[in-house]
């Protein structure tokens, strides 16, 4: 869930049927006003989570991110993370930023586990980990527990997406919940309106919700 469409305008023009981009946006694209989309503002929501961690006393915050080449969800949430640190005059330490291994499944718990294990093995000093998806966060928690760390007493962990799995994990994951059901309904409505030619192009940006869990030390 989330991100920015990586398709070019030429590619989108070739689609022969009405369509609506769902959970991805065209924000920042020159042709953003030409197509309908439904999404959250990934930069804003990632910034919100990072600022939440800062408000809980954390300044050394590691980020479990997407592939280095990613120009979609990973790039947007990385931008939000950096924006929050800079707003609080916290220098960005590139050692804190970890990218997924392209040979592993994207956004998998194994990816989160491996990135966190590497952080620990390299002795990177951090008090919190912000994973840009709940699955990465769960993998991070497991790696910390396997290393003898206590979550959140030793290291706090936060995620993003607001999945049911994050709510029922132990400890429950502090996360940004996307209004997935509402977004799905609005996407379908826009699509049918487009098919029936009832509406012009629309862009709907929804607010995420910060859901406190047990994985962040208060």
Describe each PLM feature range.
Residues 1-6, 135:
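Short beta->alpha connector loops
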Residues 9-218:
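Bacterial carbohydrate/catabolite-sensing allosteric modules
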């Amino acid at each position: 869930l989330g991100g920015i469409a990586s398709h070019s305008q030429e590619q989108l023009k070739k689609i022969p049927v009405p369509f609506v981009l769902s959970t991805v946006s065209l924000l920042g694209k020159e042709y953003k006003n030409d197509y309908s989309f439904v999404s959250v503002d990934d930069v804003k929501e990632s910034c919100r989570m990072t600022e939440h961690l800062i408000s809980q006393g954390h300044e050394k915050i590691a980020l479990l991110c997407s592939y280095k080449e990613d120009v979609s969800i990973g790039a947007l949430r990385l931008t939000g993370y950096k924006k929050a640190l800079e707003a609080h005059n916290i220098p960005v330490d590139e050692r804190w930023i970890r990218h997924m291994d392209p040979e592993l499944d994207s956004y998998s718990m194994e990816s989160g586990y491996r990135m966190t294990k590497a952080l620990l093995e390299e002795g990177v000093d951090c008090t919190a980990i912000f994973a840009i998806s709940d699955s990465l966060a769960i993998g991070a928690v497991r790696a910390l527990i396997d290393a003898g760390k206590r979550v959140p007493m030793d290291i706090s962990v936060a995620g993003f997406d607001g999945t049911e799995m994050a709510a029922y994990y132990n400890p429950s994951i502090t996360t940004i919940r996307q209004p997935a059901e509402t977004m799905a309904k609005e996407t379908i409505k826009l699509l049918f309106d487009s098919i029936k030619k009832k509406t012009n192009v629309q862009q709907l940006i929804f607010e995420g919700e910060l859901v406190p869990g047990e994985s962040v030390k208060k």
